Regions:
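Bacterial Sec-dependent N-terminal signal peptides
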Residues: 1-23
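Hydrophobic pocket/interface hotspot
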Residues: 39, 51-52, 59, 71, ...
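Short, low-complexity N-terminal intrinsically disordered segments enriched in polar/charged residues
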Residues: 18-53, 57
């Protein structure tokens, strides 16, 4: 009987742990979606203060043209130059979030820029995001063109 009670208790405790992780993952997922939305907003409004708040100091970015931006200063400068030279409405739609551990996730998003002439540039973006002091930040960005473009 003791073994049966122990088994039941073990299963119950394990299920509680998984329920908590699911709830935490849902909360973290929403925080990450909000982070990507803030990134999009900061690019559209050219808000460097917001960008510096949501990017890690050692961020690196590989843009679709093959150019690397390393470090927050280079990344912010390049993002502002790109937003100015490639105007249009930017849309980032998160397609998937994969947690590598509770503090690191990979985020895949569809990235579209609607140009002033009505054409749409369609790309993919992958973000590596990390939780620093209970705030999610972008640590790396990879922009790529889909095959066939």
């Amino acid at each position: 009987m003791k073994n049966l009670i122990f088994l039941f208790f073990s299963i119950f405790i394990t299920s509680l742990a998984f329920c908590q992780n699911t709830s935490e993952t849902k909360n973290a997922s929403q925080d990450i979606i909000n982070l990507i939305s803030s990134y999009s907003t900061s690019r559209d409004t050219k808000d460097t203060v917001l960008l510096k708040k949501i990017l890690t100091k050692d961020i690196d970015q590989l843009v679709s043209s093959g150019v690397w931006r390393k470090g927050i200063a280079q990344a912010v400068q390049g993002m502002m130059e790109s937003s100015t030279s490639n105007p249009g409405d930017r849309t980032l739609k998160v397609e998937s979030i994969r947690f590598l551990n509770p503090n690191v996730a990979l985020v895949d998003a569809r990235y579209e820029i609607k140009n002033e002439d009505g054409t749409v540039r369609k790309m993919w973006s992958t973000f590596a995001v990390v939780s620093e002091k209970e705030q999610w930040k972008i640590s790396a960005i990879r922009n790529m063109l889909p095959a066939g473009n």
